[in-house]
A protein has these predicted regions:
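Basic- and aromatic-lined ligand-binding clefts that recognize polyanionic substrates
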Residues: 67-82, 189-248
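Extracytoplasmic substrate-binding proteins
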Residues: 58, 148-151, 155-221, 316-351
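Structured C-terminal subdomain patch of bacterial secreted/periplasmic proteins
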Residues: 270-351
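N-terminal export leaders
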Residues: 5-9
């Protein structure tokens, strides 16, 4: 049985980042008094009112928002790309001291205050959101429940939830970006940004024809094995680069987000063309079992660990800002894994 998506995401990030959190000490960044005063970028003509359809109905936004709160895990990147600094963002993983603004987005923050950091281990922090006095709440890369949506809406603020067209945490990066652009009155600029990133991905795919048709899977050693499904952004990016997801995931029932397997089935990964691990060493039993597979012996694997710093975070974020940052490091690793030479070992990614 699959773990719940929210529990899985929280579990993996907690497992991987315990040393980081311990080093950071207590979190003093979460009070509303530390929040920025909000920002408003120029909007496009006739951008408002705009109505956005989502999992729980329709939301109409009447005017350009000035105080945006992100209750999903990655929306801040596109907001920053559009010149908007959110007043609150939801912490997922990575260096907590960055308050949700990572190296690929740092320049866009400018002199603005960092957003207030919200937590989501037990669901959306409704009181903390209310304390930030938002005029727009966005949760596209999320598992927002209907009850949470209703409580947020009861604050008298427009709320944009995740799409009903995909699994929770399954919205494609480009669709999320375009939705955010529409919500803040910059649909044309959002389209430009998306097209630039699509072109970069296509450029990498064209430069690496060996990726075409190669089977791949993204795997985490979580309570045995967790293999990310076709609607997960990490898997989507692999397919955009030309890979095909392995039948181990595509043939499984209820696999949109991913599937759980026992650690004993690690041997099943052996015939996958390229295995992309997220912190393989986190489970020694799984690591030892994988070392006995043809995929390991032939170097057909990549391991992205928390020691890789922001690159590790970028691999999971998959946003218009993080994708170019990721591809600079990710593509050489993938190319080494699929070059057909068992002697080639995937290069270590720079943090």
């Amino acid at each position: 049985m699959n773990p719940t998506r929210r529990r899985f995401l929280a579990g993996v990030s907690a497992m991987a980042l315990a040393p980081v959190l311990a080093a950071c000490g207590g979190d003093d960044s979460g009070s509303a008094s530390d929040a920025s005063s909000g920002s408003q970028a120029p909007t496009e003509e006739s951008a408002f009112p705009v109505t956005i359809t989502h999992k729980y109905g329709e939301t109409t936004i009447e005017a350009a928002p000035k105080r945006v709160v992100c209750v999903g895990l990655t929306e801040q990147d596109m907001l920053l790309a559009l010149g908007i600094v959110p007043v609150g963002v939801t912490y997922w993983f990575g260096d907590e001291a960055l308050q949700g603004v990572y190296p690929w987005a740092e320049e866009l923050l400018g002199d603005a205050e960092r957003p207030t950091l919200l937590k989501n281990a037990n669901g959306i922090e409704l009181e903390a959101v209310a304390a930030l006095a938002p005029d727009l709440v966005i949760g596209l890369y999320s598992s927002m429940t209907e009850a949470e949506y209703k409580k947020l809406s009861a604050m008298g603020v427009p709320v944009v939830a995740q799409s009903s067209d995909y699994a929770d945490f399954g919205v494609p990066w480009d669709e999320a970006a375009l939705t955010i652009g529409a919500a803040v009155g910059q649909p044309a600029r959002a389209e430009e940004i998306v097209e630039e990133v699509r072109a970069r991905i296509a450029e990498e795919a064209e430069a690496h024809p060996e990726f075409q048709g190669e089977t791949a899977a993204v795997v985490a050693p979580y309570e045995g094995l967790f293999i990310y499904g076709p609607e997960d952004p990490r898997s989507r990016l692999l397919t955009e680069l030309g890979f095909d997801l392995h039948e181990l995931i595509t043939s499984a029932e209820d696999s949109d987000f991913g599937i759980s397997l026992s650690s004993e089935r690690t041997s099943d990964l052996g015939d996958i063309g390229t295995v992309v691990w997220i912190d393989l060493a986190a489970d020694k039993q799984v690591e030892q079992l994988f070392e006995r597979t043809p995929a390991y012996e032939e170097g057909r694997w990549v391991d992205i660990t928390d020691a890789d710093g922001s690159y590790y975070v970028a691999h999971s974020f998959v946003t218009p800002l993080s994708i170019p940052y990721l591809l600079d490091r990710y593509v050489p690793q993938l190319a080494a894994a699929v070059d057909g030479d068992p002697a080639t070992k995937p290069p270590k990614a720079a943090a």
